[in-house]
Amino acid sequence: MRCPYCQSEDTQVKDSRPAEDGAAIRRRRACPVCGGRFTTFERVQLRDLVVVKRTGRKVPFDRDKLHRSFEIALRKRNVDPDRVERAVTGIVRQLESFGENEISTDDIGLLVMEALKSLDDVAYVRYASVYRNFREAKDFQDVLGELRGEPELE
């Protein structure tokens, strides 16, 4: 593994342990050249997923982008980072188990909303406002009604 500090190819694993409920291996590494220390995660990748955008454009699935979506929705919210990581890992597992290599942004968005609903109501509303492209205050009222279990009014 290349050192992120000095780009040396010669790094050493100092410690390995299971992470994310056994779904990954966390490795603590050290660079003998510059003395830098860093952590890497090793995960199983069942298949190469491709995201189909609303425009029809296809891009490789990016787990980090999914994680950033959670971070943006949860900004300044007090949610345990381990719960967020478990939610992201759960979504990736669901996507891989769909049996399809191509996944629509709509499918991903629905899974994110479902996960956020159980993590934090405010983050759920934030994400929904972007995902559903809210245009007026009534859109917020509708999603708040969903959270309270009220029937949707048309």
UniProtKB/Swiss-Prot annotation:
Co-factor(s): Zn(2+)
GO function term, MF aspect, one: DNA binding
GO BP annotations, alphabetical order: negative regulation of DNA-templated transcription
Keyword Chloroplast set for record: no
InterPro entries: ATP-cone_dom (IPR005144), NrdR-like_N (IPR055173), RNR_NrdR-like (IPR003796)
Disulfides per UniProt: none
Family: Belongs to the NrdR family.
HAMAP family from the UniProt entry: NrdR
Name recorded for this polypeptide: Transcriptional repressor NrdR
Organism of origin: Chelativorans sp. (strain BNC1)
Designated gene of the protein: nrdR
